[in-house]
Amino acid sequence: MPLTEVVLVDENDKPTGVMEKQEAHVKGELHRAITVYIFNSRQQLLLQQRAEEKYHSGGLWSNTCCSHPAPGEETLQAAHRRLYEEMGLRCALTPMFTLTYRLQLDNGLIEHELGHVYFGVTDDVPQINPDEVSSYEYQSIDEITQRMMMTPEQFTAWFQLTFARIPDYWQAFKSEQSR
């Protein structure tokens, strides 16, 4: 069953209510979100191209997956659920950071989210859900950086915003994993 409600939060991530997902994006209400970055053993990031039929940002490239936890669902649980539903992958996920952003999308919707960002590593082959994802590819952080500078219009607004933090967090994640 598709998620229809999001958890509204304050700037400290304390729940303040529940709202229908589309309404929250129309009104620009701050709500909880999850963002997942999956890397392979070659240190390449798994990118997804959003399905054209998505209600916003269809056809654009983005991080491995992102979504919203359901009311009462923990963010880690939501991250695992959406990683499997969108990409057919299961792997350990590590919480890395949170960030709050407000982005006006081209179609008039507003992404006002407090996002919980997770990293994971797997060499499993994605089994994409065509309702969510039209394609995928692995690229190094340097390749993505170059591509984003050349053709930013090919990427989702939130990916462009969060990606700026990824190189430093990836280095910290790798250091922690090698201990």
UniProtKB/Swiss-Prot annotation:
Residues forming the catalytic site: C66, E113
Q: Which GO terms describe its molecular function?
A: isopentenyl-diphosphate delta-isomerase activity; metal ion binding
Subunit and partners: Homodimer.
- What taxonomic ancestry is recorded? Bacteria, Pseudomonadati, Pseudomonadota, Gammaproteobacteria, Enterobacterales
Listed A to Z, the keywords are:
Cytoplasm, Isomerase, Isoprene biosynthesis, Magnesium, Manganese, Metal-binding
Q: Write the protein's name.
A: Isopentenyl-diphosphate Delta-isomerase
Function statement: Catalyzes the 1,3-allylic rearrangement of the homoallylic substrate isopentenyl (IPP) to its highly electrophilic allylic isomer, dimethylallyl diphosphate (DMAPP).
Cofactor binding: number and manner: Binds 1 Mg(2+) ion per subunit. The magnesium ion binds only when substrate is bound. Binds 1 Mn(2+) ion per subunit.
Residues annotated as binding Mg(2+): C66, E86
Gene Ontology annotations of biological process type: dimethylallyl diphosphate biosynthetic process; isopentenyl diphosphate biosynthetic process
- Protein origin, superkingdom: Bacteria
Q: Per the similarity annotation, which family is this?
A: Belongs to the IPP isomerase type 1 family.
Might you give the EC number(s) for this enzyme? 5.3.3.2
Q: Which cofactor does it need?
A: Mg(2+); Mn(2+)
Per UniProt, residues of the Nudix hydrolase domain are 29-161
Name the reaction it catalyses.
isopentenyl diphosphate = dimethylallyl diphosphate
Subcellular compartments: Cytoplasm
> Gene name on record?
idi
Q: Pathway, according to UniProt?
A: Isoprenoid biosynthesis; dimethylallyl diphosphate biosynthesis; dimethylallyl diphosphate from isopentenyl diphosphate: step 1/1
